[in-house]
Amino acid sequence: PDPTLASAKAGAKQMLDFKPDCIIALGGGSAMDAAKIMWVLYEHPEADFMDMAMRFMDIRKRIYTFPKMGEKAYFIAVPTSAGTGSEVTPFAVITDESTGVKYPLADYELLPDMAIIDTDFHMTAPKGLTAASGIDAVSHCLEAYASMMATDYTDGLALKALKTIFEYLPMAYDNGQTDVVAREKMANAATMAGMAFANAFLGVCHSMAHKLGAFHHIPHGIANALMLDEVIRFNAAEVPNKMGTFPQYDRPHTLERYAQVAEYLGLKGKNNAESLENLIHALDKLKARVGIKPTIRDYVPDEQSFLAQLDEMTRQAFDDQCTGANPRYPLMSEIKQMYLNAYYGKSFKEEPLPDAGESADDEHNFKQAYRREKSGVIGTAKED
């Protein structure tokens, strides 16, 4: 479950009562993230959550100075699932239950003092958690490698982790309670992926997954899996020719970067475009292999509910902290389009509403169409 600000405040209150000098965060990403916020509120009860959640362009040059951590308690993170990498990252994702907004907090003060990677804690993880966590780690690798803040150091971690996941996630999924080697490899891969994105940061896939999960209560790893194909295709497009977000990032070269990933995984094609398709196909096979369904609609069957919340979900995804490091900066219309494509599993195009005298039912199959009367358009699914 998504940790809430209220639960973190309640935990911090208990800490203030007995004043620990060491905090051990034992659990998956949600438990570790909640513990990080408890740690902050325990050491600095005066800290304002919205100040800490303030967005920034560069984590090293932010307007808000995060409070100094570690003066009261040492923080130890012990993951029990192989996915989030929170044990080695300066991030904590928390949901404000009063608004439903999911905030990814980021500052190097949130980095745990120690991480203990012990496979014994992973052996009883159920298949669903193994799959969702594993694909979350895949998205960490791909977004860190494509990030405009990627370096030689993060590249090596991301590539090695990704190759390990492709090899060992199916084994951990099938025989997780007995295959110690697969669990150990996945635990190490998730931590390596965490080290990669702790320095290179993430992108719009995570921005969209944060909001998809918050609005429709989809597990975070599944939400990333559902958006991954669309984001890869979006990032690999050859436009725009120039990026202006970071001056040191001359222009997008993401297609080439994805082709390098494909080559490292043994999926090289005749050219970069074919390598990209090979990579996407391999990702789809891996997701299906571990039981992840292909579309948002498989998890959110209420079409009208999804469409009713689409605009606000799009706005919040655009404003998410992770969007800034994406190699191609998206427009809100492009984020919305990716959500729609991921929902229906097809490419969509908006068309004018039919004339009043024309029966929409005669022209459009409502299983493959959506209506938004207030905007005066309908969207029709198109096969790729």
Where do the model's predicted regions map?
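Gly/Pro-rich interdomain helix-loop hinge
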Residues: 215-218, 222-306, 348-349, 354-356, ...
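Carboxylate- and glycine-rich phosphate/diphosphate-binding segment that chelates Mg2+/Mn2+
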Residues: 88-200
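Predominant activation on well-ordered alpha-helical scaffold segments within soluble catalytic domains
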Residues: 9-12, 36-39, 135-143, 159-170, ...
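Short, amphipathic C-terminal "tail helix"
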Residues: 305-384
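Glycine/threonine-rich beta-strand-loop-alpha-helix active-site module
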Residues: 6-13, 17-120
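Glycine-rich phosphate/pyrophosphate-binding beta-alpha loops
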Residues: 83, 191-224, 319-325
